[in-house]
Design a protein with these regions (language model features):
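Extracellular/periplasmic solute-recognition and catalytic clefts
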Residues: 35-101, 130, 134-136, 143
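Short, well-ordered beta-strand elements
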Residues: 29-35, 185-194, 219-222
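Gly/Pro-rich hinge or "lid" segments in bacterial periplasmic/extracellular proteins
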Residues: 1-33, 38-42, 168-169, 173
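Short helices/loops that flank or line small-molecule/ion binding pockets
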Residues: 41-52, 67-69, 203-212, 228-239
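Structural transition elements
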Residues: 1, 142-178, 192-200
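Immediate post-signal peptide segment of exported/extracytoplasmic ligand-binding proteins
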Residues: 25-30, 117, 168, 172-189
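Second-shell loop/turn segments in exported
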Residues: 31-36, 51, 102-113, 119-122, ...
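Extracytoplasmic/peripheral linker and loop segments enriched in polar/acidic and small residues
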Residues: 79-81, 88, 117-121, 125, ...
Length: 321
C-alpha cells in the first residue's frame, strides 16, 4: 500500500491514522463482523458500550452528537473519542404509488383514471417535505423534485420544485374539481416494516393528509414483521404505497430513471409498476448514448414526465452521519 500513490494528503487525512498502512498488503484486517441491529436505540447503546466500531448515527441522537448542523461537526465530548464522516447519500428516499392498484393507479375507465391521477397529485401536494426532513433527517437532508438525486451529475438544480412544496389549497381544489370527498375517497394502505420510526413516519403522513380533509380512518398502516416480508409483498404488487430508499450502483441518472422503466415492473426494480410510452421510448433511446448534454436533457425530460404523472412522492437525499 503506497500512501502517496493513493493521494494521501496529511492536511486532509492526518486524523484517520492511515500511516500504519504504508507498505502493507490488503486485506488490512483478519476479520470484519457486521451487526444488523434494527432498532436505533439498541444500535446506539451497543456503539456507546464499545461493542461496535462504526455506526450511522440515529437522527434522534443528532442533538447529542453534533455541535453544528452545517457543516456537521461533533460536540467536543464526542470529537475527543470518535471520527466523523458526514456525506450526502448517493441515492434518495421516496414513496411510490402502486399503479397496478385500481384504487389509486391505472383504471380501465378513462374518467376514473384521470380522477385517480388527480388524487395522487393532491396527496403529493399535501405532503410536507420540510417537516419530514426536519423530524426524521434533522433538517440536513436535501429535498429535491423527482427521481434524479443531487449526487447524479444529471441533477438539475433549476428543476421546478413545486412538486416538493406543500400546497394545501391546491390539493383541496384538485379533490373538489375531480369529485373526491370524504365519503368516496379510497382507503389508503401505507406499507412499512414494523419499527418505531416507520410507525412515526406513517402517523406523520396521516396527519399531512388530514389537513386536506382525508378521513384518518381511511389511511391505514399495512405493517410487516420484517423488511423481507415487506419486500416480498411489494414485489408481488400487494402494497398500495411503497416507501423505499435507493442507493445508486454508479453515479449516473440512468441508475435511477430505470426505477420507472416499464419493462422493470415488479418483481423488477419498478416498484410503482409505472408504464408510460414516451418515458420508455426515451429510456431506450438514451440507454446506448454516451454521457453528453443531449443525454442529460433526455434524462431531465424523463424526470419531468414522472413528476407530471404524480407517480411518486419524491424525494430526499439523507445526509448520513
Amino acid at each position: 500500500f503506497n500512501l502517496e500513490a493513493e493521494g494521501f494528503d496529511r492536511g486532509v487525512h492526518d486524523l484517520f491514522g492511515l500511516e500504519h498502512l504504508e507498505g502493507l498488503a490488503p486485506p488490512f484486517t483478519d476479520r470484519i463482523e457486521i451487526e444488523f441491529i434494527a432498532e436505533d436505540a439498541s444500535r446506539w447503546n451497543s456503539f456507546l458500550a464499545g461493542e461496535l466500531d462504526f455506526i450511522k448515527v440515529p437522527v434522534s441522537q443528532f442533538d447529542q452528537v453534533l455541535q453544528s448542523r452545517e457543516p456537521p461537526a461533533l460536540n467536543p465530548d464526542f470529537g475527543d473519542r470518535y471520527h466523523l464522516l458526514a456525506n450526502l447519500e448517493s441515492g434518495f428516499v421516496h414513496t411510490d404509488f402502486n399503479m397496478d392498484d385500481q384504487r389509486i393507479g391505472y383504471h380501465p375507465d378513462a374518467g376514473q383514471n384521470e380522477r385517480n391521477k388527480a388524487l395522487r397529485c393532491a396527496i403529493i401536494k399535501a405532503f410536507d417535505w420540510q417537516k419530514r426532513n426536519e423530524v426524521f433527517y434533522y433538517g440536513i437532508g436535501q429535498v429535491f423534485p423527482g427521481i434524479i438525486p443531487p449526487a447524479a451529475p444529471e441533477f438539475d438544480p433549476q428543476q421546478d420544485a413545486s412538486s416538493v412544496q406543500r400546497d394545501l389549497q391546491g390539493a383541496r381544489s384538485l379533490l373538489e374539481q375531480n369529485g373526491w370527498n370524504a365519503d368516496n375517497l379510497p382507503v389508503l394502505e401505507y406499507g412499512f416494516p414494523s419499527s418505531v420510526t416507520e410507525r412515526q413516519m406513517f402517523e406523520q403522513f396521516r396527519s399531512f393528509l388530514g389537513d386536506i380533509g382525508y378521513p384518518p380512518g381511511k389511511i391505514r398502516p399495512l405493517t410487516f414483521a420484517t423488511y423481507g416480508d415487506y419486500a416480498r409483498a411489494y414485489l408481488n404488487r400487494e402494497v398500495m404505497m411503497v416507501t423505499t430508499g435507493w442507493t445508486m450502483d454508479y453515479p449516473d441518472a440512468e441508475n435511477t430513471v430505470q426505477l420507472f422503466y416499464g419493462p422493470n415492473v415488479s418483481p423488477g426494480s419498478n416498484n410503482a409498476n409505472y408504464r408510460n410510452g414516451e418515458f420508455d421510448r426515451l429510456y431506450r433511446s438514451s440507454s446506448s448514448m454516451q454521457a453528453s448534454e443531449m443525454r442529460t436533457a433526455i434524462y431531465r425530460n424523463m424526470n419531468r414526465i414522472v413528476i407530471d404523472d404524480c407517480v411518486t412522492i419524491s424525494g430526499v437525499s439523507r445526509r448520513l452521519i
